[in-house]
Amino acid sequence: MLPLLRQEVERHVIEYGVEAFVVGNYGGFDRMAAKAVAEAKECYPHITLSLLLPYHPAERKVALPAPFDDSFYPEGLETVPRRFAIVQANRRMIGCSDYLIAYVWHPASNAQKILAYAQRQAQRGEITVTVLPRCEK
């Protein structure tokens, strides 16, 4: 999966001119995405990698892990109940992003719901969505 993700990150940099990537820090795909962007930065040092914060930084301090350059907290999440914070942070990112690289391995997951939301936005021309194929073990 990592080589495919690396290739897609590089394609977004070259073909779409993407210079800023925002990645969460809560799952295996997030870790792979951060690694793929960090590796792409070796060839494209101008790109940035931001950590998506689902909880307000004043409420929950987060030490910025390597390889992130900075963090991003979406506006308006202060009023979202904590149990919905991660899902809402992802939805808000779709609203302020031009591109999404997604991977869903379980059809009943929150990732699938977020992808469906992004695909509806893509039909309106608001975002370009790339879905990585499921890798069979």
Tell where the protein language model's regions lie, with residue ranges.
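Acidic/glycine-enriched connector segments
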Residues: M1-K137
